[in-house]
Amino acid sequence: MTIAYNPLNDPLWRIENLYHIVDKYGCKSLFKLNWAQKELYNNMWYCNVILKARQLGISTFVCLLFLDRCLFNPNMAAGIIAHTREDAEQLFKRIKLAYDNIPNSVRKEIPATNDSARELVFSNGSSIRVGTSMRGSTLNFLHISEFGKICAKYPDKAEEILTGSLNTVAPGQYVFIESTAEGKSGAFYDICKKAEKQPKDALTKLDFRFHFFPWWKEPTYRVGSIVPFPEEINTYFDHLEGSGIKIDLEQKCWYALKAQTQMDNMMREYPSTSDESWMSAIDGSYYSKQMNLCRLENRIAFVPYDDTVPVHTAWDLGYNDSTAIIFFQLVGKEIHIIEAIEGSGESLVHWLGVVKSKPYIYDKHIAPHDILAHEYSTGMSRQDSARKLGLSFIPSPRVEILPGIDAVRSVLSRCWFDEKKTAGLVKALENYTKEWDDKRACWRSSPLHNQYSHYADAMRYLCISLGIVEPKTYNPGTLGGLRSSPFGR
């Protein structure tokens, strides 16, 4: 006996034949999977993390996927989280448009019994809702949109999503986390990097599968007009082709034109590789542009200790907080940062012991200017206390924070960082940002005080104190640098 084929039993057929969207040109049209959506559909796992270029329709696809699963499966609950209420409402409009335009015969079979501004509840017991959090729900499907932005601007909300919303989804149900990159820190970065390293054939139901969708796979990202390329973009294309990515002239022209408006954000908004996506300037970041240049010029590498040149230290001394110490040498006009350490809960005596235990020949030790302040308990300044223990601090000049940040920006072009021994410092400088103002939805002018502040402060003291520690004269013939040595090549 032959059973008649019913296309409504085919999830892929339903996705491409029942639902309408408003496309990027503002026209209502029947939804059809593009290459990225099809690749995600064919390769999706229980837990999925998606790093992508802009305008590939990933959020739209996941919204329609969840709507379809709720319509054709009873007692399913789907939740969609966006980083702002306005964005959540926009995602819900896509779902509502798709539901309102399915064939009447289908909608009559599965009517919406509750149709509000943020939730659809269907007669089969399934529901789909949107918001900025899903704590307290029990979900079968969860989509977190632009999680990178949430991590960058709303770290408390990101933590709540991790501990609350993600825990509403049982193993074996479905999670989709997608975003463009927002710097080398935060939960989105950590989830992506861990998932990227995982063998895809050895994943458990709790492991995330990594998906990456670059700009150059999108067939519409090309122009027919020939445009001139700046030299740096030509060099970039050569680098891509050297790594096996082949792009044609029309794609190159599109990229060059797009880069004119996106500028430093191009690698974030339209990455070619997953590694590249993390290199773009972070919104609100003070030093990401300068640190990216350090990487491009290979100034984050092996930086050896030169025992013919003295070592200086720059400190951020916390009273009830972390202490950070940077060890650096001045070699010609280069600043070689050979080591950086940080910790909390230890006394000044402990840190002096750590510094003395290093095999370095020291010259000057820079500390914050408030090291001269006297403590009520002892009547002594911490400069006096350190001197009694055998280490003489020099207070840094009294410079306001923002001019000090400008000093760091101007000095970073001279800096070389040891890749292993200063990894924490490099990460801090790449992720040191302004504070986000939730009420005004903009960046404040002041820095965010978080785990990256201590190294960033120590670096600021280093840079504003160079006039104290730099040699009064320097002879490039006798003091070279890594640019002219085998280590810097």
Predicted regions and their residues:
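ASCE P-loop NTPase helicase motor core
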Residues: 109, 149-249
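ATPase catalytic-site recognition across NTP-hydrolyzing enzymes
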Residues: 219-315
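Walker A/P-loop
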Residues: 45-66
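Inter-Walker segment of RecA-like/P-loop motor cores
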Residues: 90-141
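Mg2+-dependent endonuclease catalytic cores in nucleic-acid-processing enzymes, primarily RNase H-like
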Residues: 48, 91, 96, 184-203, ...
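Pre-P-loop entry segment of helicase/translocase ATPase cores
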Residues: 1-47
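Conserved Walker A/P-loop ATP-binding site and its immediately adjacent core
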Residues: 76-97
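Gly/Thr-rich phosphate-binding beta-strand-loop-beta motif of the actin/hexokinase/Hsp70
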Residues: 306-330
